[in-house]
């Protein structure tokens, strides 16, 4: 999609069709932007290492960095960071933070980070020419505008047409029941107009579609099959992104601000509320120096298994999830979604885990879906290459691979559910789901793991 959009727009501007560049093994070095500088000896040493280290693009599209650079870990005030081909990542695991009356948690993301690097540094493949930047800027500006519009509407409490439709159904059901109860759901309809809901939906559509196009265009810089292939530019973007974040991390830590997490395009910090304006001024100064723009998101709590798997809860109750904590959708197979729901309800409102699980009567939330290579079999019944199951009290065993006979992982206690039933099953093993959710509490560091008992070796008889 991304390449097709860019090809069409470039043809409109230049009347030339794009040809794929020749692919050869190539060695290149990072080019340092003028604003980039560090203050500590540790980061200056790493900076020098990056500048002297060659990157190699192989003919199969793989990009390699030197072993010295790949193995380098950066330790700053108790947090460890690792550079990579794709982006910077902190190395935290099983840790949680909460905001309180004294301290706040703020996530600062760079607006359209990689696209901004491309535009700020004027990067384009030689085979395409500078017109690419014109096309790219139009796409980026449209997405940023839609994102700002969406944020403005969210602040007003707008949730979109799907939410409005849900409320209309609730009102209709209450009216049918002749209930004398007050309809709290009508308040939304009184405050938010239909046009605002439609604007919200339009902004989401533009944001999501252009995100796919823009990210896809960046990804094509590393694809040998694309007319956009330019591995040196891909590294220029990702290394600039990592070093720029390290610059800001260094400034935060030198100012006594604790960085609790960092990923490809953002940094999460925890600090005293009394210092918020001071920190905001520090970030504004950094924005002026680097020509990047940051967006702030405040959290009441952040609960991490690691940098790529976490739950973040905002003060208004909105929840951001990533990785294993994200509910199943078109991009991710469902896997006991009720456990994540129970965990989030516990973190947000203190709702007992078992209460959430037992109250749910949607069997889809108890289901795991998994691709089984070569097909799976359960109690002599062939299930096919995609297995769907829940955990029950009268399981007949495990699901096994047809070819090898080996057990499909995590199928102990399972009951296949290849067709969704009309009624909720009576044999759901609630205890399994409760224990699974309690394990998630250990994954995010809220509950200590039991100590590992080492087995003592019996002394051999002489």
Predicted regions located by residue number:
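Short, flexible helical or helix-coil boundary motifs
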Residues: 50, 57, 174-181, 448
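Intrinsically disordered, low-complexity, compositionally biased regions/tails
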Residues: 19-21, 57, 65, 82, ...
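Helical catalytic core of nucleic-acid polymerases
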Residues: 75-247, 253-255, 270
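Conserved "right-hand" nucleotidyltransferase catalytic core of DNA-directed polymerases
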Residues: 1-116, 243, 247-287, 292-302, ...
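C-terminal, non-catalytic extensions of nucleic-acid polymerases
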Residues: 15, 53, 69-70, 82, ...
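Intrinsically disordered, low-complexity regions enriched in serine, threonine, proline
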Residues: 9, 140, 454-457
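Charged, low-complexity surface segments at secondary-structure and domain boundaries
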Residues: 28-34, 122-130, 151-155, 189-199, ...
């Amino acid at each position: 999609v991304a390449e097709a959009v860019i090809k069409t727009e470039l043809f409109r501007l230049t009347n030339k069709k794009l040809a794929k560049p020749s692919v050869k093994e190539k060695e290149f070095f990072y080019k340092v932007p003028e604003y980039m500088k560090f203050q500590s000896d540790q980061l200056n040493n790493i900076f020098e290492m990056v500048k002297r280290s060659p990157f190699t693009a192989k003919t199969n599209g793989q990009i390699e960095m030197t072993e010295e650079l790949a193995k380098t870990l950066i330790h700053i005030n108790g947090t460890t960071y690792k550079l990579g081909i794709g982006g910077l990542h902190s190395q935290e695991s099983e840790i949680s933070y909460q905001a309180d009356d004294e301290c706040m948690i703020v996530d600062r993301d760079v607006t359209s980070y990689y696209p901004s690097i491309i535009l700020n540094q004027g990067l384009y493949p030689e085979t395409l020419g500078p017109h690419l930047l014109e096309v790219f800027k139009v796409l980026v500006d449209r997405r940023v505008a839609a994102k700002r519009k969406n944020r403005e509407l969210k602040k007003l409490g707008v949730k979109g047409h799907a939410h409005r439709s849900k409320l209309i159904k609730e009102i209709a059901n209450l009216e049918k029941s002749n209930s004398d109860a007050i309809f709290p759901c009508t308040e939304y309809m009184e405050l938010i107009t239909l046009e605002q809901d439609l604007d919200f939906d339009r902004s989401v559509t533009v944001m999501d579609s252009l995100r796919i196009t823009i990210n896809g265009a960046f990804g094509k810089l590393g694809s040998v099959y694309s007319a956009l292939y330019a591995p040196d530019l891909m590294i220029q973007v990702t290394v600039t992104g990592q070093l720029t974040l390290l610059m800001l991390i260094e400034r935060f830590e030198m100012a006594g601000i604790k960085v609790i997490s960092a990923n490809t395009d953002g940094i999460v910090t925890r600090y005293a509320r009394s210092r918020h304006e001071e920190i905001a001024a520090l970030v504004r100064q950094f924005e002026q120096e680097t020509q990047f723009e940051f967006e702030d998101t405040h959290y009441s709590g952040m609960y991490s298994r690691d940098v790529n798997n976490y739950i973040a809860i905002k003060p208004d109750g909105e929840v951001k999830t990533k990785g294993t904590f994200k509910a199943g959708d078109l991009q991710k197979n469902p896997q006991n979604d009720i456990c994540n729901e129970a965990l989030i309800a516990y973190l947000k409102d203190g709702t007992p885990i078992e209460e959430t699980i037992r109250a749910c009567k949607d069997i889809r939330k108890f289901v795991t879906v998994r691709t089984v290579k070569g097909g799976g079999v359960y109690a002599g019944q062939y299930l096919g290459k995609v297995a769907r199951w829940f955990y029950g009290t009268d399981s007949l065993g495990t699901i096994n691979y047809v070819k090898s006979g080996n057990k499909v992982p995590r199928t102990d206690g399972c009951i296949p559910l290849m067709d969704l039933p009309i009624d909720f099953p009576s044999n759901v093993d609630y205890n399994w789901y409760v224990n699974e959710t309690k394990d998630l509490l250990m994954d995010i560091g809220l509950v200590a793991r039991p100590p590992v008992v080492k087995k003592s070796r019996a002394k051999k008889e002489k």
